[in-house]
A protein has these predicted regions:
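Short, well-structured N-terminal submotif of metal-dependent ribonuclease cores
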Residues: 1-57, 65-77
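Active-site neighborhoods of divalent-metal-dependent phosphate/nucleic-acid chemistry enzymes
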Residues: 2-8, 89-141
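Short hydrophobic/aromatic-enriched beta-strand-loop microsegments
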Residues: 22, 152-154
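Active-site-proximal, substrate-binding regions of enzyme catalytic domains
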Residues: 34-35, 53-108
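Short loop/helix-cap segments at secondary-structure boundaries that form the rim of catalytic
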Residues: 39-43, 143-151
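Short glycine-enriched loop/turn motifs at secondary-structure junctions
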Residues: 41-44, 85-87, 129-130
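Alpha-helical scaffold domains
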Residues: 44-45, 86, 105, 149
Length: 154
């Protein structure tokens, strides 16, 4: 289950009113590209939630970016510090067998990659009404499926 910690920069009443599921592509847009819209989406009001998978994906993407010369070692260290800070300020949902079973089933818009299916399964298994959940993503496959499942997308 999730470690339930309201984000440090969100008022308690806003945190209980809506959930913002942060998918790894949005987090990476903020970390690697300093994308202003992604940064704003990450800081928006609401209870922020993500899968434990997000942090492995992000760390691997940062390593890949350094190894391929996209970022320097110093930039990687700074991004990893920002990633760890973000991890302390968000509710993290464990990668459970229920999530993996759901991820292995069909989604409304196929094909979808396995890790994207894990993110969508995590959102579904939160058990919240879709109209109260916004999925923050930059991935078109995740967007299409989120909308088809009734979730808002940012």
């Amino acid at each position: 289950m999730a470690k339930r910690r309201p984000p440090l920069d969100a008022p308690a009443e806003a945190a209980s009113a809506s959930i913002r599921y942060i998918e790894s592509s949005a987090l990476l847009a903020a970390l690697l590209e300093q994308d202003a819209e992604a940064i704003q989406d990450l800081r928006a009001l609401g209870q922020r939630v993500t899968s434990a998978l997000t942090f492995s994906e992000a760390a691997r993407a940062l390593i890949r970016a350094r190894v391929t010369g996209r970022i320097t070692s110093n930039q990687e260290r700074q991004a990893l510090r920002a990633l760890r800070t973000f991890e302390r300020r968000i509710a993290v949902v464990a990668l459970t067998s229920d999530v993996l079973v759901r991820a292995g089933r069909p989604f409304p818009v196929e094909p979808i990659r396995t890790l994207d299916a894990v993110h969508l399964a995590t959102v579904e298994l939160l058990g919240e009404p879709p109209q109260l959940v916004t999925i923050v993503t930059r991935d078109e496959r995740v967007r299409a499926n989120a909308r088809a499942l009734g979730y808002m997308v940012s």
